[in-house]
Amino acid sequence: MPSAIIVEDEVLAAERLRVLLEECNVVLLNVFHHAMPALEWLSVHEVDIVFADIGMPEIDGLEFVERIKRTAKRQPEIVFTTAYEEHALRAFELAAADYL
């Protein structure tokens, strides 16, 4: 089964995604509500998929992915959670696997 983390500043959205992933038999390793703790975690842990919100307060999801590329122990697949198509297009430029 694939492993994943969620990086989503909105608690309710993170919870909804958590339930969906568990129903799909995805092993959820962690949920983060801020990008910086997630980056620190990724520097020492491996995960298959990162579900990341684009509109986060500290650093946006696009910058978050740029930092993952520089610091992650292993490069995970990235799936962005966004309601805006223009964000999705930019995400694909950064090699996102998909968006929700």
Can you say where each PLM-predicted feature lies in the sequence?
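Non-catalytic signal-transmission and effector/linker regions of two-component phosphorelay proteins
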Residues: M1-S3
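A generic structural motif
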Residues: C24-L29, R74-P76
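Charged phosphotransfer/docking patches of two-component systems
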Residues: V11-E15, A88
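Acidic, metal-coordinating helix/loop segments flanking the phosphotransfer/catalytic sites
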Residues: R18, E22, V31-I49
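Conserved beta-strand positions in the Rossmann-like core of class I SAM-dependent methyltransferases
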Residues: I5, L29-N30
